[in-house]
Each structure stands twice: as structure tokens, then as C-alpha cells.
Amino acid sequence: MAIKINEKGRGKFKPAPTYEKEEVRQLLMEKINEEMEAVATATSDISNDEIQYKSDKFNVLSLFCGAGGLDLGFELAGLEQSLGTDKALEAFKDRDVYNAIRHESVFHTVYANDIFSEALQTYEKNMPNHVFIHEKDIRKIKEFPSANLVIGGFPCPGFSEAGPRLVDDERNFLYIHFIRCLMQVQPEIFVAENVKGMMTLGGGEVFRQIVEDFGAAGYRVEARLLNARDYGVPQIRERVIIVGVRNDIDFNYEYPEITHGNEEGLKPYVTLEEAIGDLSLDPGPYFTGSYSTIFMSRNRKKKWTDQSFTIQASGRQAPIHPGGLPMEKVDKNKWIFPDGEENHRRLSVKEIKRIQTFPDWYEFSDGGNMKVSVNNRLDKQYKQIGNAVPVFLARAVAKSIAQFAADYLKDNHPHEAPQMKLFI
């Protein structure tokens, strides 16, 4: 099977040549070597003294942390492990109550890294103040803090089915630095998240190589496609969850059992009505403006009794609010609003935050630049929310790890704070 490879020329994309599947591995190896050579010239700018470890917790290192959806879900699962589900979920509704007990979680995040300023501003507003927040390109980070658990959703535009899918898109190789972190830190467990499209890029060869590369770092690796709506998220959102357990650790990770669905014995799917129905009178700010021909080429509006379309990292691409008449298909690639465009709007920031299962108290930064348009500032919030892992999906993924962590800490209680390890 031939695979498209990106070729740049004069600032534009030339027609892509084709490579056979056996050539993909060689291409990946070349890219890995390029990335490793680049990091060799980096300098360290953090010290172990700046990292606030806890010897009685499972210390967590977060890569590509974004606004903190994955981190918050893990913290919540760790709190449920310590205090019970009812108490943790009740506290989760209120910022002050949650902040007062969040330190009880078995997970303790010590470090978070990203390059997007607004996302890190959001992270700092909402996550514990002991976390060392590192705004730096991961390709220029020479050494990472020690941790028991490394988590992260490495950037995925190059894998996305929503746009061009080119094997050598440079964004496809940031996972190498996740693996570099694993080789240096050697955490007991890691969890990586990515889009569904990574499984089929290059006929599946790229995905197979990525899983193999993670395993080569010293881990037993599993990967599975999960749908967020199966775990109480009011949204159809499929994501690949890759979990690795260090080869010497006696733990077999179990993917979460489905909790929501139409089958007997499961809770019903959470609907848009349940998630955002109470916000109709006070939805908060939302992205305004016309709809493109591409946007109107398919249905963008769900019923109140449905789950949302996947929330995208764009205000302009936000789904339409479920109120009013449904959209109508009038041609092969053309849908309309039968009662007029003025009677419909995109989902608001507050609404998509709910759909991504963030609590209402979670504040998203818009960058604070009053010189740009309202839409521009709102789009920064939409982007953060759309890029995030739904909190309740992260919570489901984390539950069995939280149980393992609690048992592991009882049996392997460290007496000294871990030290940073330099990767050579």
C-alpha cells in the first residue's frame, strides 16, 4: 500500500510522492535521529529543588498538559480512591470544597509542561499551586523531573482525520520526546492519549511503530480506542488510550468497563439536555459569525436527547446549540437552517466546558488581550477546551491505576524524595 509523504517546496505543498509501507519505518527512524540530535544541544533550566515531591503519593509528571483535563481526571480518580466516589464527586462541584480536600488524592502532580501560554494560564488558575509549570518546547527540554506516573496527550494535528494526514508532518514526531522522558525518568506507569486517526495513518504502520517504540523504552504496552460517551461524557468522542507498565512492575492494567449505554445493566448515556439544559437562559459568551460552505456541508446540530458531536479546538467549528428546529438536508453536501440562520447559534464556552465534563468553577483564560476581537479571545478558550481530554474519560482511565498506586505506596513507601535523572 502506498503512503503519502509530505514534501514542502517554496512555502507550499507539492504533490506528495508515495512510499511503500516498509519505507515508513526508515522514515520514522530518520526523524527520531533528527529529534534526538536537536535535543542534545538543549540546556537544563530546572533543578530538583524546585520540584515538590511527596513521598507518600504517586508523583505525576504531565507532558503536553494543555488546560489540564487529563490531569484533573486523574486527580479526581485518586481522590475517589482515598475518600470514596460519593464524597469526591460531591466536592468536585464546588471549587472551595474541592480545593480543601484535593490533596487527599493518591496522585500528586509535580510538573506540567506545554508551550501554549493561555492553556498554562488556565492550568495555573485551577490546578494546585505546588505544580511546577514549565512553559517550554519539549524538544528543548534536556531533563525531566522524576515521577511514578507520566501522562500526556501528545499533539495530534498530523494524525487528525479532519485535515491533511501526512506521514512526516513534524507534529507526528513529538511522541519521541514522550518516550525520551520515559527513558530518562523510568516511571512505573505511563498513559498517553491521541486521536482515532493515528491508528490508520499510513495503513496503520505508523501506529504500530509508535506502540513498538513505547515498548522499547522498557514497558509492556497496550492501546485501545475508547468512546468518551461510554463513561458519562455527553459527547461522541473516540480517543486512543495507550498505557504502559514498566517491565519489572507486577501490575496488569485493566481498561475501564463501560458504564453508560443502551444495554441492560448500564446507566443511560448522558444527554445534552442533562448536561446543558439549565444553561439556556444564561449560556455565557459564544462564537459568532457566518457559517462556511464546508461547515454547512453536513448536519451540525444534535437533538436534546442525543450526545454532542466531538468538540473541536475551534470556536468557528463549534456544534450548533440543540434548541429550535433541526437542520435540513437540501442537497448532497448542503444543509440549511429551515427557520433562518438568525435563530441558531454555536454552543457557548460554558456549554462546551460542561460537555467536556469540566466543573463549572474551572476558569479558562482568554489571554486577556483586549486589543483583539471578542471572537479571537473566545477562540482561545474553545481551543483549550476542544484539545482537552474529557475529565470523566480521564477519570475512568485512571481508576485502576489509582487502586494500584494506593497498594503500591503501602508496599513501597519511599523514605527520600526522588532525584532528577539526566538522560544521556
UniProtKB/Swiss-Prot annotation:
Superkingdom of the source species: Bacteria
Q: Where is the active site?
A: 156 (s-methylcysteine intermediate)
Provide a GO biological process annotation: methylation
List the catalytic activities from the record.
a 2'-deoxycytidine in DNA + S-adenosyl-L-methionine = a 5-methyl-2'-deoxycytidine in DNA + S-adenosyl-L-homocysteine + H(+)
Q: List the InterPro entries hit by this protein, alphabetically.
A: C5-Methyltransferase, C5_DNA_meth_AS, C5_MeTfrase, C5_meth_CS, SAM-dependent_MTases_sf
Q: What is its EC number?
A: 2.1.1.37
Question: Keyword annotations for this protein?
Answer: DNA-binding, Methylation, Methyltransferase, Restriction system, S-adenosyl-L-methionine, Transferase
In Pfam terms, one family for this protein is DNA_methylase
Query: What's a Gene Ontology MF term here?
Result: DNA binding
The protein's PTM annotation reads: In the absence of DNA, can self-methylate two cysteine residues.
- Domain SAM-dependent MTase C5-type: from-to ranges: 58-408
- Give all S-methylcysteine modified positions: 181
Kindly state the subunit structure of this protein. Answer: Monomer.
Q: Tell me which family the UniProt entry assigns to this protein.
A: Belongs to the class I-like SAM-binding methyltransferase superfamily. C5-methyltransferase family.
NCBIfam families, per this entry?
Answer: dcm (TIGR00675)
* Protein name from the UniProt record: Type II methyltransferase M.BspRI
Gene that codes for this?
bspRIM
